[in-house]
Each structure stands twice: as structure tokens, then as C-alpha cells.
């Protein structure tokens, strides 16, 4: 124990015993931890004498660190102890185990960055090309690395899922970064379907190749020794050139980027195909009455990507058509924002338009307006139709019998006879069965008594002693006109 305890002495031992096992904990490192570490090193077949120096601790750390992921808790504790002891030997102050581990990680990261930088500087000094897929090996030879099956699979999957929608073009551009004409032809040949579109693409490539030949005529005379021939349009398309020639053109000084030129031709043809597969014009993109504004904006910009126009024209379309083709609800909101509103402000302002909450709010406003108009109409109608009441007792208007000041009439208010009230009166008005109202008692009670009744006495009261006898024809006519009491003739006329 004494031999192992002599690893630290003097000021190093005092610094060791001030370091805590855990951040904020009470327990600190002691000599027993060094003794335990030396025994564990023997168990792992390592030399315990390495604990006495900084370089020895560094070697132990290098041996134990790769095994931390699969090691036991004892191995991790041993590693932590060695790291703390490593910084005590360097006289670097640490407060606890975690701080020592953080310092070690930071030190290793800096060392790794320096190593990578040195490797990169060495590669640049030797002129090694890092331009994928054309790489320069250590012998200085240009080597082509073909496209991986994963890249080709991603391209085929995009074509199968998206057909030739506008997002296919940036996907093709990303997957074909730095590719040679041979790589580009490999990508095009992997497309199984859509042969009509591929034929359109071939026609576009042939047109661009012919234009290249017209603008870059072949120089007369033989080619000087050691100089490459100039690429023709068919060479750029990869039909009359080999892979070695393509690499030589792309890496010569000055280089001829045949891969980038061919890529531009393909993208030009893809733009034509996208326009054919997206026949909808930007002028036809209009927001539906119930369509959320966000979905409308998505459709608008998806169609705008397929439009073959300059950025200035697309900006004008966005500022003008996006507001003009919105539905009335959103258009009102967008016009209130003004012409300088950003897309974020538009989408925030129109958020919820067309949704359930917006519909409920509009419906509530419409119902409140309709209800208010109906109430005002009813109030105005009631003002013009004031009910006129009539007293049953005195027959005057303006009050009812309960408030009448005239002497109370005796008997029934309906027939005038005493002995019963109006509710028990047997004299009924004409019903739907045709029961007639006595002609000598005026009009029935359900008619207004506005017709003046004759006040002259009957003819027999003059005392002439003569009776006015009706003629036989008049009597027969009266019998025919008066229907029986239980007849429906009074209701339906001569149909019965």
C-alpha cells in the first residue's frame, strides 16, 4: 500500500484530496482510491507504475477509453479516477470528476481538429482533387467514382412518386452534383416509364447540341501534340465521347465543364416536361369559397414553380394574383393589409378563414342582423294595428265591461234574456253545419254590429186590421231558398 500511496506527495496529494467525486457532493478523493486503481490495473493486465507520471496516465486513458461503451461500472470508475489523476499530475485545477472529464473531451476535440487540418493541408499541397465523383488518388491519377445505387434509387423513387412535378428539377440538380455526362445518362436510363416525356427530353438535348456546334465551330487544321480536341455537342451529351475524355475535359487547364453543360440541357428539357405535366395556368388558381388560405397559397406557389418566367414576373404574379384570386372573405382582409404586406402577415391575417369558427362567427352575425330586422319590423307593425275593445255592458268602445261605469245589464249579454249568463247561453251563432241566426235578432255575435237596424214598428202595429198575406209564388220561393237546419247548403252553395 505504501508503494502505491507514494504516487502523489506534497502539494499534489493536497490537490487530490480537495477534488469531489460528484459535483456538489460531500465525498472527496482519498489515498484509498489510488490503491484501488492500482489493483484494478493489475486485474486488467496493465502496469500500475504508469500512474506515477502524466504520460503513463495518458497511455492508460488511451487503452481504457475505447472500451467504455461496453465496459462495466468498475471500468468506468477506474477511467474516471485515472482522468482526475492525469490533471493532478499536470497541476491543472479541477473541482470534481465531471469537470475533469469535460476538460479531457475538449482537449481531445482540439487535437482531432488539428489532425484533420493537417491532413487537409497535406492533401492540398499534393494537389489531390476532392471534387466528387472525380477523385485523384495518392498516385496522382484521376479516378472516377460512379453514382451509388442509393442515389439512383432515390432518383427513380422521385420520378415514380412525383412524376414530373416542379420539385423534380431541384431534386435532379442535387443528385447530379459534379456528375459526368456518363453519370447523367445513367440517371436518365433508369427511368422506366414516361417514355413520351423522355423522348421530349432527347429532342431538347439534340436541339441544344446542334446550337452548341453552331456557336463553337471546329478549328481547321490538325490538333497540336499534347492538346485535346474540343468537345462537340454529341461529346457533351456523352454519345461520342469516352469516360476518360470527359474526365480530361473536366480536369484540364482551363477546364471544359462538359458535365455542367449537359446538366443545363437536361434541366431545360425537364422544364418543358414539367410545363406539359402541369397544364394548369397560374391564372386559373383561385381560392374556393370554403378553402383555407394556407392550402390556396400552397397550390398557388406549386403552380408558380412550373411557370417559365423571370423572377421579376413571378414577383409581380405573387403580389397581384395572390390577392386577386382569393375568395371574397380573404380578399377583404388582404386589401385591408395594403400592398406592402408580407406573405407571413397575409397567412396570419387569413388564418381560420373558411374554418368552423369563422363560419360560426359569420352565421351568428347574419342571424343577429336578421333577428334585429324582424324585431324592428314587428314593432313597426304593432304601432299601426292598435286593437279596439268594446264593452259588452253598454256597447261603447274604449273600455271593457269590467271597467264600465254604466248600470250593469241584467241577464245574458248575448241574447238579452235573464236567468243565465253568456257562457251558458244556448243561442249559438251560425256554425259550419249551417245553423241559422234568427233574422229578428240582428247579425250574429261574431259580426260587427255596424249595420243600422230599422226602427219603424211592424205593419200590424198600425191598427189597420189587415194582414199582409204573401202571394203563393213568393211563399213557394221562400220555401225553396230556406235550407234545413242540418244542411250544408249554406256552406257549399248549390253543390249539395
UniProtKB/Swiss-Prot annotation:
Where do the segments described as Interaction with membrane phosphatidylinositol 4,5-bisphosphate and RNA lie? 14-33
Region: Disordered; residue ranges are 103-124, 436-496
* Marked site (Cleavage) residue numbers: 132-133, 363-364, 376-377, 431-432, 447-448
Per the annotation, the residue ranges of the short sequence motif Nuclear export signal are 16-22
* Region called Interaction with Gp41, residue ranges: 7-31
Positions where Phosphoserine occurs in the chain: 148
> Does this entry carry the keyword Lipoprotein?
yes
Motif location (Nuclear localization signal)? Answer: 26-32
Region annotation Interaction with host AP3D1: residue ranges?
Answer: 12-19
Which keywords describe this protein according to UniProt? AIDS, Capsid protein, Host cell membrane, Host cytoplasm, Host endosome, Host membrane, Host nucleus, Host-virus interaction, Lipoprotein, Membrane, Metal-binding, Methylation, Myristate, Phosphoprotein, Repeat, RNA-binding, Viral budding, Viral budding via the host ESCRT complexes, Viral nucleoprotein, Viral release from host cell, Virion, Zinc, Zinc-finger
Task: Name the SUPFAM superfamilies on file.
Answer: Retroviral matrix proteins, Retrovirus capsid dimerization domain-like, Retrovirus capsid protein, N-terminal core domain, Retrovirus zinc finger-like domains
User: Which portions of the chain have biased composition (kind: Basic and acidic residues)?
Assistant: 103-112
List every stretch annotated Dimerization/Multimerization of capsid protein p24: 277-363
PTM per Swiss-Prot/TrEMBL: Gag-Pol polyprotein: Specific enzymatic cleavages by the viral protease yield mature proteins.
- Any one Gene Ontology BP term: viral translational frameshifting
What ranges does the record give for the region Interaction with host CALM1, renumbered to this chain? 8-43
Query: Which Pfam families does the UniProt record give?
Result: Gag_p17 (PF00540), Gag_p24_C (PF19317), Gag_p6 (PF08705), zf-CCHC (PF00098)
Q: Where is this region: Interaction with membrane phosphatidylinositol 4,5-bisphosphate?
A: 73-77
What other remark does the UniProt record contain for this protein? HIV-1 lineages are divided in three main groups, M (for Major), O (for Outlier), and N (for New, or Non-M, Non-O). The vast majority of strains found worldwide belong to the group M. Group O seems to be endemic to and largely confined to Cameroon and neighboring countries in West Central Africa, where these viruses represent a small minority of HIV-1 strains. The group N is represented by a limited number of isolates from Cameroonian persons. The group M is further subdivided in 9 clades or subtypes (A to D, F to H, J and K).
PANTHER family documented for this protein: ENDOGENOUS RETROVIRUS GROUP K MEMBER 24 GAG POLYPROTEIN-RELATED (PTHR40389), PTHR40389:SF4
Name listed for the protein in its UniProt record: Gag polyprotein
From which source organism is this entry?
Human immunodeficiency virus type 1 group M subtype F2 (isolate MP257)
